[in-house]
């Protein structure tokens, strides 16, 4: 009976692995111990985002802090539920950026652009905030719901693909070589919005659905050197690829529940994709795939779990260095520094 149960469990686990990923080579890797040195009075919560700048400084946007909620005439005003920390390249704590910001409530992602500006995506305030390297707010996209009624457009979407510069639970941000800004308006609206480098809305594409060009959700996005946009359509278990204007090009179907994407720099770009289940799901899958930009699997590493070299819902990957990754986890409340061999 015990042998039968073990066989059934093994078969079930194999069935959970995406078909195209079952024979992918394993990439050897290590997890660096104590990669981030936190002060005694600071802790990480669920890690929405992790990113590095050109100097190697590390930024972590985490769901921790002390939310402040004030009941207004019609809606609550809330802020402070997430915090943005900076560490130097050796993992030593440097500072907190944007403390008590109006736009910080539920950390979705942090990215650093080619000019070392820091971009924060917040899922609850429906805002994307750009900070300059000194930590000053330089641009805002989206709009938070007002604490009192005002004549304003609603940010709530119905997933129908409406053309709007407002968001409903955005998840990620990326840029092309010309500086155009792409926002994954991923959970409420299931679309990708394009803005000029000055923050002027251009267009959006996508809506709720399962057909080509539609999304169950857009968990993460990345842009390659040619300006193509890659979207992690986790609910539909695929990565979709579009040109710079939102025209569908192709899809990668064998990536499991695609949650986090990261595009490397340089001439020979590769894409990292996390196959992550929600934190309350069973401990299965959890690996990260390394892929060529034509969708071929180069290798994979890691699995679901709580130990070093295991992952608990990877929501963010930083791959400025192709073989030195920072991985932010929701389920394990941590950032791991990984060295790939």
Map each language-model feature to its residues.
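N-terminal secretory signal peptides that target proteins for export/translocation
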Residues: 1-3
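Eukaryotic scaffold repeat domains enriched in small/polar residues
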Residues: 20-341
